[in-house]
């Protein structure tokens, strides 16, 4: 079988890895043999993840790969799509009590990889610990039928017809930049934080079900506490999912896009609730509304999907789209929703997501997930240095929100080889 990839695949170059890493910390040491069995069984349920990239004419397609998905007994990074990875665009690993998943955004984005992760963890936990306390109703098991909606290409052939749409918001041409001396530029560093969900959301907008706007305000206030002369807007690129606008709620491609959200220098004197409300108005667009559909249309319009477009034209179009969507912001924040652990969190202590590349080397990146009763936050930057992390934690403390720094880590991400 062949599948259409995320169109950002055409933007791939040495500065745009478009891969991510998940680290799941279990409550006991990981059995590599049992994990390998769990991965092998789980992948039979997800043929659209068992793929290798292939050039067909002037397009890239994902072709079913019969070779096994690697499960390493360490934390190694490999080149996704390479022989070391059996040509696959994802791989697993484990070390001590941690499980690692490296995957390409070209096969999934948003929570598209979430069902696979839960299947693997369920099969592993069932063998190692038994099934007590686990709910299988929302876990795909290997013998379950595969719905067409899971792997169908979610992008329409033509833009939606929209009435009464507001103009798409454009990020300011100049955004507040981070202090280059805040990091030592010695590789990618992550700082792991835990925040109780109830404690934080009690301080946020009561109608805001997402932590994104509140965390963005806390980050904004941290910048202001460090720099009394901010004259440019602080701009976040915020991950937003248009699943409902596309009517593909279970699709592996949830159509993750980035919308600019910003606060002007004058906002530094606003009350936190006012800041949160203003930012929330920019971030939470709602579902199936004209503005959401218009944002979808922007992506469709950017796609070089004309039949006569050659590979070079597709690459140029997508690189332009990536540059306009990602570069030039102050920080990025991503939250794909509350994790439905189905009882698996009795065996999971922590989970963190990692991203980062040269196109974002002057930005802070925040990945927000949930486990148990906590938000788990990964703050990532291009080098070691706690200037912004400490300032962020201080702002939470001023709001009487408990926050725990779990640790810091120098990390690496997988590169990807493509037949371009």
Kindly give the residue locations of the regions a language model identified.
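Short, well-ordered loop/turn elements at secondary-structure boundaries
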Residues: 94-96, 206-209, 232, 327
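Histidine-centered acyl-transfer/condensation active-site motif
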Residues: 84-130, 135-146, 369-388
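Acyl activation and transfer enzymes in specialized metabolism, enriched
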Residues: 27-46, 102-118, 189-231, 377-379, ...
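Acyl-thioester-dependent acyl-group transfer interface
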Residues: 1-59, 67-91, 224-420
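A short, mixed-charge helix-start or loop-turn motif at secondary-structure junctions
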Residues: 21, 102, 181-183, 204
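Conserved catalytic core of two-metal-ion nucleotidyltransferases
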Residues: 61-63, 140-141
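Non-catalytic, low-complexity flexible loops and terminal extensions
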Residues: 2-5, 107, 111-115, 119-202, ...
